[in-house]
Each structure stands twice: as structure tokens, then as C-alpha cells.
Swiss-Prot record:
This is Glutamyl-tRNA(Gln) amidotransferase subunit A. GO terms for biological process: translation. The keyword Transmembrane helix does not apply. Heterotrimer of A, B and C subunits. The gene is gatA.
Amino acid sequence: MDFTNYKAHELKDLISKKEVSVEEVTKAHLENVKNIDAKVNAFLYIAEEEALNDAKALDEKLSKGEDIGLLGGAPLGIKDNISVKNMQNTCASKILEGYISPYDATVSESVKSQGGVILGKLNMDEFAMGSSTENSAYKITRNPWDLDRVPGGSSGGSAAAVASKEVPLALGTDTGGSVRQPASFCGIVGLKPTYGRVSRSGVVAYGSTLDQVGTLGRDVKDCALLTQVISGVDHRDFTTANINVPNYENSLSENIKGKKIALPKEFFKDGLDPKVQKSIYDALEVFKANGAEITEVSLPLADYAISAYYLLACAEASSNLARFDGVRYGHRSESVEDAVDVYFKSRSEAFGKEVKKRIMLGTYALSAGYYDAYYKKALKVRNLIKGEFENIFKDFDAIISPTAPTPAYKIGEKTENALEMYLGDIYTVPVNIAGIPAISLPCGVADGLPVGLQIMGNYFKEDTLFNLAYSYEQSTKWHEMHPNL
């Protein structure tokens, strides 16, 4: 019995029935990591000893008849910008090389308390700045569907690990599409919750008003299960909302009769791969057959989302990343004359090219004389975009679009063309600007590569997204596709 072929909810059932132990499941996945990860490069740190100790402790609890929580012994991986006690937390950057977190992020704490077994930390674009996981200071993660292609980013390690069956579940972060776009490229399910639904405490900040921890799994049920575990108010993060978290498993119904879905015409213009467009239109027919009503709408300001996003995200990054100074941990320059030198030289040597570029852009946008012209204007555009979404959700339950304009591209193909790389997030960025939830799920194949469908919902309506996504998933077979490694 190969336990790596099972989804997390299936493993949970097998473990609860005592048909298999948590330790056996953990060992099987660790073995798969050892066999596969040299090809995929999803992991930055493998926590073999910690994982086996945690698995044995959970088996001990089960032997005493104790409940081990919602995850019930399922293994998972954590993106390397989310703190896990006594594990590295490098953000895939040299400036945090060797840094070991002394505490758990709230989401890591939640995962552990609900019986999740953390197998290690996953690769990412440095400080979550990128869409391909080529910006990691340590290694380039490869797409399990084609090892010459990118897995997406910045949570590329998370998506690749799930798609290659190294883990059934993973946590990532999503600032402008960093969970959904890799999910699309790797043919899995990825959810970015509403801003404020999940705690950011213990997560290294990139854009504090845009960042949100998201979940990745091989089907909608797994994604819903992990989202249930990490959602809720947290006194350590004042931006979390004290709004009831529904039982997401109850929303996994195939019935979507009467659901109203909006289709923004601006998301189906030039730049969208015709094969991706066909997959989305084919998916719409499934939603119609299942009883949903689909209407074309207009989101004219969505065209300005990328511009506003890069101003806001970079401005926030320039402030957030000022704390990495080479003094207390991580890389410290050796060719220094004084304390000021430590700060400037350590940062210059240790930050990667993309991170430096975004810090400089953000500092420029916040500087005297440019604040009103750029940053303040971007805030105004953000409010207008939020208003457009709010107006649509007065009449509709959800909005559907592609997740990305193309399938996964070749490693190195877009590294010299920043604009083309940034435009890859054209459908995902508006979601973060508005703070709404969105899910990506597989809906087709283009040239042998997965295509993702994005469903956007109203604030704190993740249950509606799970309902729509589950209905589609159960009517199709795309979630059963797997790469052949």
C-alpha cells in the first residue's frame, strides 16, 4: 500500500480506523521526499527526526483513545517564511541563512495542535518576491509536470511538493497570487483566504496589507480541511477578524443550483493563451450544467491592479525588510569598517537582485515629492477596485476567471523580462488588492501542462468557494491527473 497516493482526508480516515499508524504514513512520505526531491527541489529543509518523533507521539495518543485533531496525522510541508519552532526560517534568502526560529507561527501551532506532522520547510522566491521560484538564493524548484519548467511562485516549493506527492498538504503565502498561480501551474488546488481570516503572526512580512497564508492540496476537500485548521481570530494579529468560521466540510456539496457567477470581460482579452481560454469556457459549461447562472460583467479598474499592486507591495516591503540588518542573525559582511557599514554591506551582499529592486522601488514611491504622485494614488486605486468588487458581490455569489494567462513556462524564459513576469499575475493580483478570497483548481490541460480556474468570492465566503469548487471537481476528472516522475 503506497500511502503517498492518498489524500490527507483519506489518510486521516485510515489512521483513525487503526489500519495504519501515523509513523508508517510519515515514513512513507519521507521516503518519497528522499527519492523525488533531488529532481524537484521543493524542500529547503527536511525535518526527518522531528517528524518521526511527532508521529510517534500522535500514535501514543491514539493508543490511549485520545483525539489527535482535524488533520489526524496527515503529513504536510510549510513554506520557508512561516516560523516553525526549532526549524530554519530563511525566506530563501542569504540574509537569513542559518536562522532558526525560536517560536511557532500561529498557523504552525494550529497545524501541530490538530495532528499535522510537519516534514520540513519548502522553497520559495526570496522573501516571496517572484512568480517562478527562480529567485530563491538556494535552488530553483522544478515543475513536476515538466522538470524544465517553473512551478510558479512564490510558493513554488509548496505546490511542487504537493503535486509530486511528497506531501498531501502544504501551507504557502499569497501576496499577489503566490498560492493560486503555483497551484495552477502544478495542477493542484490552492486557496487564498480573505485578508483577516488567517493569522499572520510568525509569518515574515512582505506586504502587510496584502499577505495572507493559504492552503494547497490535491483536492478541494483537503484544502477545506487545512483551511479549517488555520482559520480564526488570533490575539497576536490584530488584523484577524472576529468572524465565525463555518464548518467548511459542510459546504462540500455538489448542489450549486441558482448560484450566480460573474464573468469579467476584462479578464478575457489579449495576452490570454487560447488553450487556457478554451479550458475556462469548457469549465463554465460544467457550472451551467450543475445549475449555476453565468453573466458577463465589467471590472474596468482591474487593468490598473498590477500597477497599484507593485507600488503598494514594494512600499510595504521597503519598510518591512529594513529590519534585516546583518547584526543579530543571518549573513553579516566581513569587509566592514563601522556599524553603518555592517548594515549597508550585509544587505547589499545578501539580498538578491529582485528583492533589491523592489526595496528600491518602494523606497522611491515613499520618498518626499513622490509619495502623493505614486503611493497615495495607488491607495486611491485600491479603494476603487475594492468598490468594484463589492458592487459585483451585491448581485453575484462568485466571479470566475483564469488563474494565470498561460500554463507553466520554461525555467529562464522570463527572467530578463520583468514586465512579462509581472503580467503573469494579472488575474490574481486584484484579489489581494481587494482582500477577497479566491481558489484555484485544475480545469484542463494545454500542451500537456495543467490549466487553473480561479473562483473569487465575497469577504469571508470561503464556504461558497469550496461549494462551487467541489461541485466542479466532482463533475470532472482533472483533479485526478498526476505528473509522472
